[in-house]
Regions:
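Residue-level signal for pocket-adjacent positions within structured domains
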Residues: 6-8, 13, 22-25, 48-49, ...
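N-terminal small/glycine-rich loop or linker at the start of catalytic domains
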Residues: 14-21, 57-78, 113-123, 143-156
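Active-site beta-loop-alpha junctions enriched in small/polar residues
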Residues: 27-29, 54-56, 84-86, 112-114, ...
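Alpha/beta catalytic cores of nucleotide-metabolism and tRNA/nucleoside-modifying enzymes
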Residues: 1-18, 22, 28, 149, ...
Length: 382
């Protein structure tokens, strides 16, 4: 076993110290309270675990689903919410609501989502192209947040001909943002190809005043340490790498604290985590069957690399109770060891996409006419 040197300095986001400097990326439909609980259990509570995307309009309107999504376990600290919005006024209202009602300790703003339903409204990773709009949103958010730190997560740009991350980073510094996270891909890439870690290094050089976090292609603890070593970034944001692998956060703690401890669970151990995950979802939703149904999306990620036949996978994909799930899992060859090569890419991998944008979006990065509150989404999560 290789012993790794501990990180040289903790990550500081406003008043919060994040050590080791590891952040769970917000993922719609994934990073709800049950999944965050699992990840925190494996990390011993170390790190920062961000909620799935909350739309500012839905929060201000107190949408029922959204109010559930902002629930935090009593032991979660700091409480971290990611907001999505395209209208500065609505974003400001949402942030003030969070502050006045003590709903979170940290606010992250989403400028990285590449999903067409978001970008075609000028939101997510499309928004930083409109520099004045980005500045206005950040100004409103930071002013409304008061002592709560505001951070942003973004991509390199819309495509290779329309890169925005350096301008966006500078605007973030000027408007009082406490840290920036960069996914080293463009919107057009979605999750395809290879993340550009050199861009993360360039951003760190460009905005030395605040922490820069790197995101993209972190599949194991070695990747995280290598990213920090090669880019000089101050921390890492882990997204798809923890799908079906919540114990990755335990590995990350071991790597950054110098123990090098890694988990290689047998299928029996993985099955136990799967059952606990489904149980937590049912408790959180308040309905066992709905919890198990929601868990189905995770099955393939947990079983990646293990020898599980197509018929058994099909059965697991249609389970609707904990008893049924437990019975199906018990029928697997649970003595299988951790498979070689199981730490590779998971989740969506499509790339080279045509980006859905509002008409005329790319004509002028400083023309924000036509972008208004009607572009706000009224639902949160996945």
């Amino acid at each position: 076993m290789t012993t790794l040197a501990p990180a040289s300095a903790p990550l500081r986001i406003g008043p919060h110290t994040v050590q080791p400097p590891v952040v769970l990326a917000p993922m719609a439909g994934i990073t709800n309270a049950p999944f965050r609980t699992l990840c925190r259990e494996f990390s011993g509570g170390k790190g920062l675990f961000v909620s799935e995307m909350i739309t500012t309009r839905a929060l201000v309107e107190r949408n029922e689903k959204t109010m559930q999504l902002i629930h935090f376990d009593a032991s979660e600290t700091p409480r971290s919410i990611q907001l999505y919005g395209v209208d500065p006024v609505t974003v400001g209202k949402a942030v003030r609501m969070i502050v006045e009602e003590d709903l979170a300790d940290h606010i992250d703003l989403n400028f990285g989502c590449p999903v067409p339903k978001v970008t075609r409204k000028g939101g997510g990773s499309a928004l930083p192209y409109k520099r004045p709009l980005l500045r206005a949103i950040l100004r409103e958010a930071v002013a409304a947040a008061g002592d709560l730190p505001v951070t942003i997560k973004m991509r390199k740009g819309i495509d290779d001909d329309h890169l925005t991350y350096l301008d966006a980073g500078r605007i973030a510094v000027e408007e009082g943002v406490k840290a920036v996270a960069l996914h080293g891909r463009t919107t057009a890439q979605h999750y395809g190809g290879t993340a550009d870690w050199d861009a993360i290094a360039r951003l760190k050089e460009h905005v030395p005043e605040i922490p820069v976090l790197g995101n993209g292609d972190i599949w194991n603890a070695d990747d995280a340490r290598r990213m920090m070593r090669e880019t000089g970034c101050d921390g890492v944001v882990v997204g798809r790498g923890c799908l079906g692998r919540p114990w990755l956060f335990g590995d990350l703690v071991g790597a950054f604290e110098g123990t090098g401890a890694r988990q290689a669970p047998s299928l029996r151990e993985v099955a136990a985590v799967m059952l606990r995950h489904a149980t937590l979802l049912g408790e959180w939703i308040g309905d066992e069957s709905r919890g198990v149904i929601d868990f189905r999306k995770h099955v393939a990620w947990y079983l990646k690399g293990f020898a599980v036949g197509s018929e058994m996978r099909r059965k697991l994909a249609v389970t609707s109770s904990l008893d049924e799930l437990g019975t199906q899992l018990a029928g697997l060859d649970l003595d299988q060891p951790w498979p070689d090569g199981a730490d590779g890419p998971r989740g969506r991998t499509s790339g080279n996409n045509r980006v859905a944008l509002p008409d005329g979006w790319l004509k002028d990065p400083y023309d924000c006419a036509g972008v208004g509150a009607d572009a706000e989404l009224d639902t949160s999560g996945g």
